[in-house]
Amino acid sequence: MKTYLDLLSHVLNKGIDRTDRTGVGTRSVFGYQMRFDLQIGFPLLTTKKLHLRSIIYELLWFLRGDTNVAWLKEHGVSIWDEWADEKGNLGPIYGYQWRSWPASDGRYIDQISRLLTMIKKTPDSRRLIVSAWNPALIEEMALPPCHCFFQFYVADDKLSCQLYQRSADIFLGVPFNIASYALLTMMIAQVSGLKAGDFIHTLGDAHLYSNHFEQARYQLSRIPNALPSMLINPSVTDLFSFKFEDFELLNYEAQPHIKAPVAV
């Protein structure tokens, strides 16, 4: 996936070295955009193997409106464990904001359900938006949303999605985010009777942690393979009815995983 490797190279060669909240230190650029045509293939990195199971289960977890790691752990996914409290709670993070955004009048807004209705009724709307960034609740979240705002666009019977990500850990996090939102776009397109269009990924602070530099250089030495395809069970017409078994990745030829520490 040359588009992603170009990002790695750009940050390594053009980025500014800065301090950060974790104390590790980063090299970063401010403002970067990638575009992936979902008709060409599923944008899952081939220059290192990714754990697709975690990506799919995390997305289904978000769509459930869940904010406790118990369900993830039941399915062998531990990517949120570092931030959970002793009871497994993470506070009002992504799933809560997507499905139960608290309004000032006491209502709870299901942004995802509202989005699905709007795509069908007013596909030309410029308000096909979901936000996870709720300033009133940031302090209650175990980790404020990094991928915080996304918008859909319908044209020529295709559904495209643009994500704004304020904070982008480009070695560990961004490959997951690309695959997750590409898959979400495909799922919403299917249940809306549309084809998947483009996924556009806009990054704010795009950074490499200083203890990921060598891994990034090693990954840049690898040559990408052809993209895989994602087969989604065509019988599913309700977004909230998808199960892990409804997804099948075809022709994924990835090079070995590259280990790197997580900055908490």
UniProtKB/Swiss-Prot annotation:
Pathway listed: Pyrimidine metabolism; dTTP biosynthesis
Catalytic activity: dUMP + (6R)-5,10-methylene-5,6,7,8-tetrahydrofolate = 7,8-dihydrofolate + dTMP
Entry annotated with the keyword ATP-binding: no
Residues annotated for (6R)-5,10-methylene-5,6,7,8-tetrahydrofolate binding in this entry: 51, 169, 263
BP GO annotations: dTMP biosynthetic process; dTTP biosynthetic process; methylation
Record: residues binding dUMP: 21, 126-127, 166-169, 177, 207-209
EC number of this enzyme: 2.1.1.45
GO molecular function term, any single one: thymidylate synthase activity
Superkingdom assignment: Bacteria
PROSITE patterns according to UniProt: THYMIDYLATE_SYNTHASE
Pfam (any one): Thymidylat_synt
InterPro entries in the cross-refs: Thymidate_synth/dCMP_Mease, Thymidate_synth/dCMP_Mease_dom, Thymidate_synth/dCMP_Mease_sf, Thymidylate_synthase, Thymidylate_synthase_AS
Gene3D superfamilies in the record: Thymidylate synthase/dCMP hydroxymethylase domain
GO CC annotations, alphabetized: cytosol
Keyword field contains Transferase: yes
Catalytic center residues: 146 (nucleophile)
Subunit structure: Homodimer.
Cross-referenced PANTHER family: THYMIDYLATE SYNTHASE, THYMIDYLATE SYNTHASE 1
Function: Catalyzes the reductive methylation of 2'-deoxyuridine-5'-monophosphate (dUMP) to 2'-deoxythymidine-5'-monophosphate (dTMP) while utilizing 5,10-methylenetetrahydrofolate (mTHF) as the methyl donor and reductant in the reaction, yielding dihydrofolate (DHF) as a by-product. This enzymatic reaction provides an intracellular de novo source of dTMP, an essential precursor for DNA biosynthesis.
NCBIfam families: PRK01827.1-3, PRK01827.1-5, thym_sym
UniProt protein name: Thymidylate synthase
Species of provenance: Bartonella quintana (strain Toulouse)
Name of the encoding gene: thyA
